[in-house]
Amino acid sequence: YPMIPLSSLFTNAVLRAQYLHQLAADIYKDFERTYMPNEQRHSSKNSPSAFCYSETIPAPTGKDEAQQRSDVELLQFSLALIQSWISPLQSLSRVFTNSLVFLTSDRVFEKLKDLEEGIVALMRDLGEGGFGSSTLLKLTYDMFDVNLRNNDVLFKNYGLLSCFKKDMHKVETYLKVMKCRRFVESNCTL
């Protein structure tokens, strides 16, 4: 295999994370439009199903906190977040059979796996092949539920999609912080 420059690895990882975050936001909006009446949208944001497992790990919650962490830590957090979604996203296409979600769900899983490989490559290049992230987040998210006629299931899936969107935003932020820190660019915005 030819050596890929570190800057290219970061660029590819950031692009994948941006794409996944946008896809997660689109899926969330499509689900909301299709399944959640306006009056339920606000009440569900405060429900226990809106709790994200990622809130249980000591990961930075924004770019200012992320800038205080090492690149290795940010990569470990990113890998833990991504790996917590791999199993749940395998079932996504079975849940939403007739919408934008269905059309994009297989792509989401593939892109998530690509991003996981990219982060593993970055960790290897930065000398962090030990993958210390396994201790960060042992939990994975629940599977998406297929019974969309049940309100509890709707809220659960809505909460999962909300968490996926938040987690992909975190990964995107962490990767951008690392890239900007390492490669001073004129268009480096967070």
UniProtKB/Swiss-Prot annotation:
Q: Is Secreted given among the entry's keywords?
A: yes
Q: Which UniProt keywords apply?
A: Disulfide bond, Hormone, Secreted
Please name the GO terms that the record assigns under molecular function: growth hormone receptor binding; hormone activity
> Any one Gene Ontology biological process term?
positive regulation of growth
List all disulphide bridges recorded for this chain: C52-C163, C180-C188
Q: Which InterPro entries match?
A: 4_helix_cytokine-like_core, Somatotropin, Somatotropin/Prolactin, Somatotropin_CS
UniProt-listed Pfam families: Hormone_1
Principal subcellular localisation of the protein:
secreted
Q: Which Gene3D superfamilies match?
A: 1.20.1250.10
Give the UniProt entry's GO cellular component terms. Answer: extracellular space
Localization recorded for this chain is: Secreted
- Is this entry keyworded Disulfide bond? yes
PANTHER family for this protein: SOMATOTROPIN, SOMATOTROPIN,PROLACTIN
Described by its record, this protein's role is as follows: Growth hormone plays an important role in growth control and is involved in the regulation of several anabolic processes. Implicated as an osmoregulatory substance important for seawater adaptation.
Family per similarity comment: Belongs to the somatotropin/prolactin family.
Q: What is this protein called?
A: Somatotropin-2
Origin organism is Acipenser gueldenstaedtii
Gene it is expressed from: gh2
